Each structure stands twice: as C-alpha cells, then as structure tokens.
Amino acid sequence: MFSGIVQGCFEVVEVVKKPGLITFTVKVSKKIIKNLKKGSSVSVDGVCLTVSKISGGRISFDAMLETLNKTTLGKLKVDDELNIEKSIKVGDEIGGHPVSGHIHGTAEIVNIERPENNHVVTFKCDKKWMKYIFPKGFISLDGVSLTVVDVNKKEGTFTVYFIPETLRLTTFSFKGQGDLVNMEIDQQTRTIVDTVEIIIKGSDYAK
C-alpha cells in the first residue's frame, strides 16, 4: 500500500527488453535506498512493482506483459524519469489517500493552464471510468495522490490543480499536452458506486 505522496522523481539508466518482459534500472537517492531490500514493493509511476535487484544507488524492477500493455511502462526508455514512492508501513501517516498501485488505465493530458502561482491540468480518460470520478474526490495519477477539481463526464475529462511542492518532487513539472499518465481510481469511491448500482438494479428486478 502507498500514500500517493511521491518521494522524488529519478532517472532510468538501463532498460533490457525481452519477450513479454522488460527489466529496468533506476538511479535513486540514499533516502530511497534506505531500508529497501530485494522483494520490497515500490510505486513506480503509480505501478506497484517488486524490487528485483539493488546495486549501489540503483534499483531494478521487472515489468510483465500485462503491466506493459496497461501502463505507460511499455514505452519506457533510458533517461526517462519516474515518480518513486516506497510502500508505507503500519502506523505511517497517509498524507494523500490509500493507493494500491494497481492501475486501471491511462489518461491523456489535454490541456495545461498556468495562471499566476497555479498549475492546472485537464486529463481525458476512457469514459467507463468517469462514473467513479467526482469533484473533490481522490485520484492517483502516475502515483501522485490528487484531488479532482472539475469533471466533464460528457467529454470524459477531469481537472486537477498542482501545488508547487508536488511539481518540485514529481514528473508533472515537465509533462506536456498529449502525454499519458497511469491512472488509479480511488478504491473506496469505486466500491460505493458499484454497491449503489447493485442495490438499484436489485430494486428494479424486484418490481
């Protein structure tokens, strides 16, 4: 489990592609390396991956075909930067919202506005997910816990604001229009919406 509070963005230094699998290595800080071990879970651009190797200040991960097809990791290359967060432990503060690292799909950046002291980004996703996205609700994008500000369900878009600290610590500081990000719907919201739908359908069947 993760909190959606990214601990920094770090550079990919190696990508090894094999049939249905890639192994990639990221150069990280001493703070990230501390207490990490082979088998640890790490959020990498929002995707929960297992550390396969630690060597000096570098950590390696394997990403399988399902992950490559569903997330942006399928297009990963050397010099890319990734948002990294170590998993939280029992008793740790959840500064954002509970994030599992199980990606539902990708969202595209369709607009960026930069009014004074603000960074406003609009995303577009598959409309099937829009029933779970509400103003003031949580969403995880590339592993970052964010609060939705505005929603256009007809267009399949939603808007979020980024504070300067989030931009400083994440890859969103240099992402542009047309870029794709990994999206994880808030599980609590999804459970509530699906439960209500089941109840309503049950009432309809009973009539």
Predicted regions and their residues:
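Conserved loop->alpha-helix
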Residues: M1-K207
